[in-house]
Each structure stands twice: as structure tokens, then as C-alpha cells.
Amino acid sequence: VLFRSKTLNIHPVKAEKDDTDLALGVEQAIQKGYTEIDIYGATGGRLDHFMGTLQILFKSDYIKKEIIIKVIDKQNEIMLLNTGTHQLHKSDKYQYVSLILVNGEVILSLSGFKYNLNHQHLEIGSTLTISNEVNRSMAIIEVEKGQVLQMRSRDLE
């Protein structure tokens, strides 16, 4: 967890505990009043830890408080989109946008994309919303029902 300050207090925790180091760090950042948190270095290595990182995005307290948490690496940026309207600016860094269904059914509308959708009903297992592209200065994602993981990505050169 990266804090925007000149000093960083490190609080060691026991190796054997009921949460991951990252989950504890995110909780501490939120307790300090941060409402936007960028997480770096959490996508490589063990898949169980990566999946645990994604679970943090779904914590109901964070959703209720509208905490924005992004998981970022050299090729991707992942964040949770809940029901509502979301603006997405075209990016020179990330060419592709994928919307991953994570639970139940989703109803999506997309505008400003290469492949737009209008009140599209989707269920788990669908790959319809993989590898889209923003083709205007700003695109709109309307999550009418459900939740999706928004993944912005780029090919490595």
C-alpha cells in the first residue's frame, strides 16, 4: 500500500494471523481517512494471494464507504464497479478495457467504446465484455444491475 506522505510508519504483524498483510494495510489506510487506495505489487507470484487481493475489493464496508481501491501492475489496472454510472477516460497507457462478471447476473450499457452495449443481460461465464477499447475521449459504463471488475490493460512491448 503506497501512502502519499513523507514518512511511513511500519507496524510489523505476526506471520500467523486471520488476515493478509495487505488486508491489514488497506484497513489501516482507510482508518487514517484515505478514500482512494492504489495497490502495487500484488498480481505476481502466488495466485491465492492475488485472489485474496481481489477479495478486498468486495468488502462490504469499503463499498458502503465508496472507497476506491485499484490493483495496479506494469500491464494492468483492476477496480470494482458497483451499480451506477462510471466515466472512463481514454488512456494512452491502457488500450484495452475488460469487464469481468464476478457474481450473479449483470445488466450493462456501454457507450464510447469500440463495442457498445445497450441494457445487455450477462451471466457468469460470458466473455462478451473482454478486450474492448475506448474510442472517444470519454466512455460511459452503466452497471444497471450487479458488479463487475473493470480491467484496463495493455500489451507489453
Residue ranges and their predicted role:
Residues 5-7:
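Short, structured coil segments at secondary-structure junctions
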Residues 76, 81-157:
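Long, charged alpha-helical interface segments
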Residues 11-31:
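Short phosphate-binding loop-to-helix
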Residues 44-60:
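Short Gly/Thr/Asp-enriched flexible loops that form oxyanion-binding sites at enzyme active sites
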Residues 35:
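Short acidic/polar active-site loop segments enriched in Thr and Asp
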Residues 61-78:
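Short, acidic/small-residue loops that bind anionic groups at enzyme active sites
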